[in-house]
Amino acid sequence: YCDTALICDVLEHLQPEPVLYPPHLKGVSRVFAQWADMVLFGAAMAYCLQPRGAQALFAGLPDGAAEAFRNDRRAMGTARTHPADATAAYRSYLRRIANMVEEHDFLFGAEPCVADFAAYHPLWFTRECVPVMADILSATPAVLEWMDRMAAQGQGRAEKFSAQDAVTVAAGALPQPLPAEAFQDEHGIPLGSRVTITAESFGPEPTEGTLIAATRTRYTLARTDPRAGDVHVHFPRVGYVLRRAA
């Protein structure tokens, strides 16, 4: 499953309680989470990774780590925002979030939903990973209090799982049956066609495979990998571009 937006949908299906998408807030929580993933995240990263923040973030890492990171971001084709512009935007977004959490414990009520988690992670990065830049948060104490409530949710239980372990599991497993959802054709590309899917806003590398599902919300490609065997790769429709393979 590619993209956290789709992964959240899958988690909601596997574990419906507690809800990520409250029934009366499904639309607005998705829209807010999409804004946080793109706009808020972009402003926060551009703010945090200006020279002072980048120097602190990469301090103590092996020589060449910062340059490798810059080259990786450049290859992804992400647009660079001037630090002053990012700072102004980030401050504005923090004030907007403060307005929301002054009325409720969480963004849309008494319990956190997908919107809270989407908004929290770039702010968490500012506070925990680049603390030399975290002074921007002090102007919005309501946001800091909300962040404390989010942190109190805990981190769950993590287990180390290497890339090779994941490949081994995939090689020994079969793809799950596809959901019984209607084929929604927006491109004039029939099922069974060789296609590529590419992220709309970052990362130029296409994923190629056979289109085996195109529902209202996602695409599924069948691929055969020499190491992982037969796999199904799922993408959300929003944010990804479907094309016939050349």
Question: Where do the PLM segments sit?
Answer:
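GST-like domain detector, emphasizing the conserved glutathione-binding G-site
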Residues: 1-64, 74-76, 82, 189, ...
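Short, hydrophobic secondary-structure boundary micro-motifs
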Residues: 20-23, 108-110, 159
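GST-like fold's C-terminal all-alpha helical module
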Residues: 36-152
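Histidine- and/or cysteine-centered catalytic micro-motif in compact active-site loops
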Residues: 111, 122, 163-166, 200
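Short gly/pro-enriched beta-turn/loop segments at secondary-structure junctions
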Residues: 112-114, 189-192
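Mixed-charge, Lys/Arg-rich low-complexity intrinsically disordered regions
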Residues: 155-191
